[in-house]
Amino acid sequence: MTTETRSLYSQLPAIDRLLRDSSFLSLRDTYGHTRVVELLRQMLDEAREVIRGSQTLPAWCENWAQEVDARLTKEAQSALRPVINLTGTVLHTNLGRALQAEAAVEAVAQAMRSPVTLEYDLDDAGRGHRDRALAQLLCRITGAEDACIVNNNAAAVLLMLAATASGKEVVVSRGELVEIGGAFRIPDVMRQAGCTLHEVGTTNRTHANDYRQAVNENTALLMKVHTSNYSIQGFTKAIDEAELVALGKELDVPVVTDLGSGSLVDLSQYGLPKEPMPQELIAAGVSLVSFSGDKLLGGPQAGIIVGKKEMIARLQSHPLKRALRADKMTLAALEATLRLYLHPEALSEKLPTLRLLTRSAEVIQIQAQRLQAPLAAHYGAEFAVQVMPCLSQIGSGSLPVDRLPSAALTFTPHDGRGSHLESLAARWRELPVPVIGRIYDGRLWLDLRCLEDEQRFLEMLLK
């Protein structure tokens, strides 16, 4: 060991001496004596490793208390941190999809603080059914005979197939064999449910006769899968649910549909592209329709199945239903969200998802212009801060080819170096409330479609 190395080792403080320092008293009160000591031992090991490797002391050795505080503060942060979503994707899967309405937040808080009538019937003091209240709401909204709720739409599809078609064939168009995030593929789900997939048609064209020829004595279902996360365009042919239901009645085979994102209102009335609605498919005679709670519906993560009473009864009695059932917080949030749909005139104001999707480009443009000046003053030495038009997307596999005109604040480095954009984006991710944008075409873009709290936004970026 060299003299220089020995000198560096000698500069490392003893743990008991550090703990006697007044700056560590509050740290021990906040994080506990044991955790502070554990971290100091870890940091001493790190410092010795740096000395061995580079013959220097880590920079943080100048202020041990400050480094311990920084590390423990970061460690204590929740894994689910609030962020400001300026990615341009409204229903961002990685950021939790739909924001909940205030009514849903209040309902969840109440369900967490107090015992609730989850499976208790107040009329006869007997055991109730956890889906009953929501089933009544869903039937009122969609016109279905009954409903079933599980923890997400993937679970809904799995339960729907396992309870009604296990050991039998399910006929699906080849152009509808979708894969969603996480490599969740319809063929794989069918295998897991114990079904045999019977593909018909081609990728771009499937006719009624393709389904007819596929039906045999082992056919359990005719299935439609809404291709919500991609679009096949050009020379195409697909039959709709009404035509498939007519064929199913002729052949005595029920029709089920995985609708995916599942909007409960006609989005075209808000100037958005129209998505098929569960109530339309129920009216067409589809036996079961599944859809998500946390996409266009704007509620919590949930899988919702509506349809014919006898079919829903098979789902409710299947062993998988208990494994996949939703908890009381999910049910509370979903009920509160569904009740908003009973008053459609106020929906775009009270439902955050719809409110954000329907913000006009003009309003967002004015907001961007208002925020440009303070940000340009703060970042102008390194970046050109501009207001630019952009296109938002709905996200979570909803309306994949449709974009929403929006406006963004863009940051372009004066020296043109992309590394400066990466550094800026990284700095913003380290803020107490991280600001998440996207880097594209030599700029860092902050799409303001989802920005409602301007004060918090400026507090973060002007730090």
Swiss-Prot record:
Q: What is this protein called?
A: L-seryl-tRNA(Sec) selenium transferase
Q: Which residues form a coiled coil?
A: none
| Annotated pathway | Aminoacyl-tRNA biosynthesis; selenocysteinyl-tRNA(Sec) biosynthesis; selenocysteinyl-tRNA(Sec) from L-seryl-tRNA(Sec) (bacterial route): step 1/1
Q: Which residue ranges traverse the bilayer?
A: none
Its UniProt entry gives the catalysed reaction(s) as: L-seryl-tRNA(Sec) + selenophosphate + H(+) = L-selenocysteinyl-tRNA(Sec) + phosphate
What the protein does comes down to: Converts seryl-tRNA(Sec) to selenocysteinyl-tRNA(Sec) required for selenoprotein biosynthesis. Requires selenophosphate as the selenium-donor molecule.
* Biological process according to GO: conversion of seryl-tRNAsec to selenocys-tRNAsec; selenocysteine biosynthetic process; selenocysteine incorporation
Q: How does it assemble?
A: Homodecamer; pentamer of dimers. Binds only one seryl-tRNA(Sec) per dimer.
Is Transmembrane one of the keywords UniProt gives this record?
Answer: no
GO MF annotation list: identical protein binding; L-seryl-tRNA(Sec) selenium transferase activity; pyridoxal phosphate binding
Q: Where is this chain's protein located in or outside the cell? A: Cytoplasm
Cofactor (UniProt): pyridoxal 5'-phosphate
Q: Which organism is it from?
A: Escherichia coli (strain K12)
